[in-house]
Amino acid sequence: MKIFFTLLLCSIFFITASAQSTIKGKVFDEKQKPVKGAAVLLLQQKDSTLVLSALSSENGDYSFNNIKNGNYRVMINMLGYKKLNNKITVAGNNVQVPDSKLVPDAVSLGEVTVTSTKPFLEQRADKLVVNVEGSATAAGSTALEVLQKVPGVMVVNDQVKLAGKSSVTIMIDGKPSQYTDISQVLGTMSAANIEKIELITNPGAKYDASGGAIINILIKKNANLGTNGTASLAVGTGLYTKGKDGVDRNYYRVSPFLSVNHRKGKLNTYGSISFFHRNQFQYSEFDRAITTNRFLQTNYSPNDRNSYSYRAGADLYADNKNTFGIFVRGFNFTMDENTINTTQQIKASTGAVLSTFSTLNNTNVKRDNIAANINWKHNFDTTGKDLNIDFDYSTFQLNNNSDIVTQAASTSYLNQYVNNPVKFGVLKLDYSYPFNKNTKLEMGGKTSLAIIDNYLVFKKSNVVDPSRSTDFEYSENINAVYASFQKKIDNWEFITGLRAEQTIAKGKSISVDVLNRNYWQLFPSAFLTRKISNHFSTVLQYSRRVNRPSYQQQNPFIQYLDSLTYTRGNPLIRPELSDAYKLSLTYDNQPFFSVSYNKTHDVIFNDAPKQEGNLTYTTPENLAAFENIVFELNFPLDIGKKISGYGGNQFIYNHYKADYLGSLYNRSKWNWQAYWQVSYKPKPGWNFELSGFYTTSLLEEFIEIQELGNLNFAIQKTFMDKKAKISLNFNDILFSQKNRGAIVYQDINLAFRQVNETRNVRLAFSYSFGNQKL
């Protein structure tokens, strides 16, 4: 492996081209501010033949490398501005083009309608950007369903995995969500509200150190003048054979969505609201071998879900130096679920049925969340020196009531009631100081405080059981400071950073302290980028990360899933630390090839299984060292002018080594994941889209999960001058997204199969109204 890395580094970083001349320049607007995204064309003077093209960076910079001697013309285009031209001559020397100042085009500003289409994938120095907006297969979906279509992301049992790693931090508009039930938030968020998703596999010092990787979901925000908005409605139904698929009804969804934006002068206001009604199911089978007997279980869990979410805010552009913002968002979620469990105890040697019993679990869930933010951005001058201050406050309330009735030789009645309020506040400060256009220093600090109460009342035959009831109070205060230094030298760019975090965590159960921690940790990071040519670039990354145990994992209470299964928290688990390395090669800012290596210590096994007589329970444990290696190869699927898309492969190696239950658990496994998305546009206004993924069997802690996949197809038509859009989606056409697997370790022998409501058809309509022009 060391030889491979050495050869790969040498072959990529020391590729050089024969020509040496470089053309550089910078683009400013009429207020002397750097312009990002201006189209810069390098043309031959004699016949205007296109030589190369580029987009100006965030600092307004552009460059062309390896240019032959000759006479050229640099043309700069930007929507709403007049074209600029500069004539230059290259004669074996580097050329610095005079700064280009764009002049507004008053005529075009009133006539241009924004119709540009972004590529689905964009590779940037520190992240992969997935442009969800405009995707046909995303129409009518939830955010959780959209994540399943993102390259390298898998969602298993509502748990998000990225490149084989399950320690993933989900953020919404850069805001943390670690104290909310993020799977429920994403499961009720309309995809119509999402602009793009950022995958940050090796976050820098500016980001929280928590989590092995970051998935940042960015909400749409319109900056057009006047009043504009979008209204949409999505409906869908499941496609199942009642007898064959084990369901007793049809399943459907309804999801209306409305967003409005108004910008006049210095004030921009916006808001959105969505409603989501869905009924769905989960069907599972378990086969447990315990001594000489087998327990065969089936669980059928139909449920009805209702939720609504809202978002409102305003940005005030007070002057050229100060911008103030405020917003509030929230959601309400309710679910009624009735799980029917049937268990047979069978003699393993003869197959004779020894006993049969059934369990009915009626669960009512209610979740409420409200979050508010105020922010201020101050630009000290036009060089990019700025200060950002953010304050966030949110509350989250979970109520869960479960009635569990088991019918065997006699009938038992159990009841679990959970009351779980959460309060969370964050104050963050970020400062950026560019010394010049090639050198920049960033620094900042952050403090957060979470106060959580988890109150559980357990009753048996309507009598409170004090031994199983608990009141777990938890608080977590995280303080952080960071600094990051960025430098560009010719075709090289490096970023190095250091983040220091203090964690103060306290927990007590029924007035007894079970947790009291106070510690500091350092998290270095480094990025090295080289632009090999006008098409190829390479990036080498390193970061240290931490995955802190959640308050649910540290809560020592017992939660019964059925009469034979329960889970229990562990207040003694420690944070896990990981070191992550990644080397990637990009072509025209598209992800092409990468290799990454991750080493994690004190790995938290979230569901470490244990056998207690006929009962099986799981608990979080620090068990293992974990190695993860990922080779990734992506490629475009562009054929002519009508077919476009991408395909990709990931080869993932997971290795766990742990001492558990008196024995050594030492297992490793390779698996292959493939994903694709292809669009066919036979004529303007029509789009046919095919997407999906496939993965071979993989290892997740003690569980070996069998192969699974997904195939989706969508038809989309735009009309009414591109303001209206209708989409018809067929999801999981082959009904192949089924979770199957097994746990075999010492006296634990369990096989399972799980089916969710994934095969469905959806019809979505959206209409953009108001001013769609700049």
Descriptions of predicted regions:
Residues 219-236, 280-287, 296-297, 305-312, 397, 504-506, 534-580, 595-613, ...:
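Surface-exposed extracellular loop regions of Gram-negative outer-membrane beta-barrel proteins
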Residues 45-61:
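Short, acidic Ser/Thr/Gly-rich low-complexity loop/linker segments typical of extracellular
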Residues 94-101, 143-146, 184-185, 199, ...:
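N-terminal periplasmic accessory domains that precede
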